[in-house]
């Protein structure tokens, strides 16, 4: 049976984009999509229609910096990189996510 990707939970696209850019470095949107897919071994496939609005929101909040440049294929592309505020936000969100996963694990396993 073929393995399918996991559903992207509401509110996680911004978190995934921040993580991709924090660890993968400066990238344009399509590279962010590819990085998330490859790094998650295909388990997380973000749609373009979800990613680009998320990148715009992150940029507006000052968590990403963006600039136009020419891509490897000779096309104009908007490149993103994480700001110091974005790194702080990623750290805080990572802690919250770890806490959430641990709490769900306790409930599912019936731990007290």
Spans of features found by a protein language model:
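Short, contiguous hydrophobic alpha-helices characteristic of membrane insertion segments
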Residues: 6-7, 55, 111-112
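Beta-hairpin "wing" of winged helix-turn-helix
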Residues: 59-76, 81
């Amino acid at each position: 049976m073929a393995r399918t990707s996991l559903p992207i939970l509401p509110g996680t696209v911004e978190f995934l984009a921040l993580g991709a850019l924090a660890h993968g470095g400066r990238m344009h949107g399509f590279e962010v999509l590819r990085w998330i897919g490859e790094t998650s071994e295909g388990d997380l496939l973000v749609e373009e229609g979800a990613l680009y609005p998320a990148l715009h929101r992150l940029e507006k909040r000052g968590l990403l910096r963006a600039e136009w440049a020419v891509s490897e294929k000779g096309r104009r592309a908007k490149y993103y990189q994480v700001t110091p505020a974005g790194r702080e936000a990623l750290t805080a969100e990572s802690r919250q996510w770890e806490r959430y996963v641990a709490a769900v694990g306790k409930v599912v396993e019936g731990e007290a």
